[in-house]
């Protein structure tokens, strides 16, 4: 079975580095264009997460795949935090904190995918990339809480938490041992 790739890349999609800055439906402020369709890159990443997380190798077919990879790795980080949460409210607080926590971007030490991502070419692009990734992180965390927590029990679903130990492409956005 092949890995799933993003189908959201358009010819006029803006790039930051070699990563697509795709539109998203978001309640958070940021540089991402507003999405008007039903599905955006975050929905796509969450939908394909359970299938893609098993792949150790992933062929990048377009710049949107780099955005998909980043969100997939971020979902793994979110699940590590959510497994320790006792309620959706606590999970949302954890996701907000994780979303705004300082994080490395391509080109900086500590970013695990520097071999596949181009660093921003100037200070302005650096700021736009950081803001876009933060917007993706915040919105992904919020939407993931809706998927992970069972509305009846207010506990994390074992069908999501079972993926905590899986590493997509043998990579992690957090350092070793975290």
Swiss-Prot record:
Annotated Pfam families: P21-Arc
Subcellular location: Cytoplasm, Cytoskeleton; Cell projection; Nucleus
Assembly mode: Component of the Arp2/3 complex composed of actr2/arp2, actr3/arp3, arpc1 (arpc1a or arpc1b), arpc2, arpc3, arpc4 and arpc5.
Homology family: Belongs to the ARPC3 family.
Protein name per UniProt: Actin-related protein 2/3 complex subunit 3-B
Source organism: Xenopus laevis (African clawed frog)
GO molecular function, one term: actin binding
Entries under PANTHER family matching the protein: ARP2/3 COMPLEX 21 KD SUBUNIT
Lineage of the species this protein comes from: Eukaryota, Metazoa, Chordata, Craniata, Vertebrata
Keyword Cytoplasm: yes
Known role: Component of the Arp2/3 complex, a multiprotein complex that mediates actin polymerization upon stimulation by nucleation-promoting factor (NPF). The Arp2/3 complex mediates the formation of branched actin networks in the cytoplasm, providing the force for cell motility. In addition to its role in the cytoplasmic cytoskeleton, the Arp2/3 complex also promotes actin polymerization in the nucleus, thereby regulating gene transcription and repair of damaged DNA.
Main localization of the protein described in the UniProt heading: cytoplasm
Domain of life of the source: Eukaryota
InterPro entries: ARPC3 (IPR007204), ARPC3_sf (IPR036753)
Keywords annotated in UniProt: Actin-binding, Cell projection, Cytoplasm, Cytoskeleton, Nucleus
